[in-house]
Amino acid sequence: MTIRKMTELNITEKRILIRSDLNVPIENGIIQSDARILAALPTIELALQKKAKVIIMSHLGRPKEGYYTKKYSLFPIFEYFKKKFNNTKIYFSNNFLDGIKLNPGEIALLENTRFNKGELNNDEQLSKKYSDLCDIFVMDAFGSSHRMQSSTYGIGKFVKIACAGLLLISEIDALKKALKKPKRPMVAIVGGSKVSTKFNVLNKLSKIADTIIVGGGIANTFLAIDYKIGKSLYEPDFVFEAKKLRDKYNIIVPIDSRVGKNFCKNEQAIIKSPDNIKEDEEIMDFGDESIKKIISIITQSQTIMWNGPVGVFEFPNFRKGTEMIAKTIANSNAFSIAGGGDTLSVIDMFNIKNNISYISTGGGAFLEFIEGKKLPAIQMLEENFKNKSK
């Protein structure tokens, strides 16, 4: 992989367009988690230090393309930036496609890219307009790097210089460290509701990790190979595929589970073995014996890759498995990498973000990189380097 890095370029007084990932949860105009903003700051701060003319763009949520929707406006992030960069002139622009004038050391935050018609379909005219805004394009949104859209991919065809920002490089380096030459033993923890969405990830990780621990609805599909699991969430169509994986690789499934009769916050948990689950019961978390076994595996590991909770952690009585796994990873001296939306929510819930070696900002991009897919944004950077270096 040959791409330019922002750190290798002279960006002083240049117009720098940074595609950040500022897709943060906002309720009633208040940012609920600034994790992605904090991850984006080093690239922005470097550009300011170098006295660049800094233009920042991002998407937020899933608005109807081409239409302004207040709920999805980046204005709350503009307010956040004003406090963060209180000694810097910063502008908010919702009418930027015909150009922006900035002085060195100033910032312009652009309105939601998805308000622009053609963004999602990688429209060439829109991509060209983006490219006209800058001298150098910096792709720093790892969380959107699997999207072939105008602001993440199409712009690379027209801009003279496209490069990777600090966050994108750190994401790639951390994932390569875990996937290419991991310290042994390596354990991968894969939770979530569906095997179908993570089958390729499981297949890939099974060839790399020494042990795979499955949780949530994914684990239920593996349990359904041998047991009747009541009304638990699982995918009947993937039981055969799950069996092929289990028979070939070292995949750990729960030996006991916390079950309940109703999917609700205050439901009482009962611990049962998988051969004793009634028709009106559903699995919602690991049992204590499973937790002990998994803690032992994690404690002995030198590399830990974690994607997804292993139970319904939003319900207090079905949180223990996810909580104990999270805290065990946090207390480990192993190299740990965590990614995926729900995983980040767990990390926030238990306040362990400073105890994980690397927290990926990517959800779909995180999984696709693990699968070995070529991410469109990385492909764009490679093609720009190759074509513009001739």
Curated annotation (Swiss-Prot):
This is Phosphoglycerate kinase. GO terms for cellular component: cytosol. It catalyses: (2R)-3-phosphoglycerate + ATP = (2R)-3-phospho-glyceroyl phosphate + ADP. Substrate binds at residues 21-23, 36, 59-62, 114, 147. It holds the Pfam family PGK. Belongs to the phosphoglycerate kinase family. Monomer. Gene3D superfamilies: Phosphoglycerate kinase, N-terminal domain. Transmembrane segments: none annotated. Its EC number is 2.7.2.3. GO terms for biological process: gluconeogenesis; glycolytic process. InterPro entries: Phosphoglycerate_kinase, Phosphoglycerate_kinase_N, Phosphoglycerate_kinase_sf. ATP binds at residues 198, 314, 340-343. Its main location: cytoplasm. Pathway: Carbohydrate degradation; glycolysis; pyruvate from D-glyceraldehyde 3-phosphate: step 2/5. The gene is pgk. Keywords: ATP-binding, Cytoplasm, Glycolysis, Kinase, Nucleotide-binding, Transferase. It is an enzyme of class 2 (transferase). It is found in: Cytoplasm. GO terms for molecular function: ADP binding; ATP binding; phosphoglycerate kinase activity.
